[in-house]
A protein has these predicted regions:
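Pyridoxal 5′-phosphate
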Residues: 1-170
């Protein structure tokens, strides 16, 4: 039995994109949860989570978001949030982390309930500025520019290209 399908949205060795719009509905039709890893595609390949409706999404700000290491994230589809329960308790997983009442612990009602103890703030500060910068440009603009550069490379070195030739697959 399969309970969870983990899919890398983009593969680092080839740039190949996984067909999420095919995989996610197929998994859902069989009652299988989906976890999408967007570490290689965040910031360069636009995703519409309202259309795709994955159950979970993970990523980092290292690659195209240029945010540096240490700022990873977990997104949980609101439909799945109640099903998921943390295995550990952390300061920031509390509904009110500044209450300091160990006899009245309530998990936060969002994905924050999975956050552990005191986080290192530096990676998140760097990531915030980087994400804000690229958000002003727009992921579609960045994607189009990247595709133009890939087309130039594909035209000059067609025999050397490892990535798919078709732009919608890379």
């Amino acid at each position: 039995d399969v309970h969870l399908v983990l899919v890398s949205h983009a593969y680092s060795n080839s740039g190949q994109l996984a067909p999420l719009s095919d995989i996610i509905p197929m998994a859902k039709s069989r009652g299988i949860l989906t976890l999408i890893d967007i570490a290689q595609s965040a910031g360069i390949v636009p995703l519409d989570l309202n259309t795709l409706k994955p159950d979970f999404l993970i990523g980092s700000s290292v690659k195209w978001l240029c945010g540096g290491p240490g700022a990873a994230y977990l997104w949980i589809n609101p439909d799945q949030l109640q099903m998921c329960q943390p295995k550990d308790v952390g300061w920031f997983s509390h509904d009110n982390p500044f209450e300091f009442d160990i006899h009245d612990f309530r998990f936060h009602n969002s994905a924050l309930k999975f956050w552990g103890g005191t986080p290192s703030i530096a990676p998140y500060v760097i990531a915030k500025h980087s994400i804000d910068y690229f958000a002003k440009i727009g992921s579609q603009e960045i994607r189009e520019h990247n595709q133009q550069l890939m087309n130039l490379i594909a035209g000059e070195f067609p025999d050397k290209l490892i990535s798919p030739i078709e732009p919608h697959q890379r």
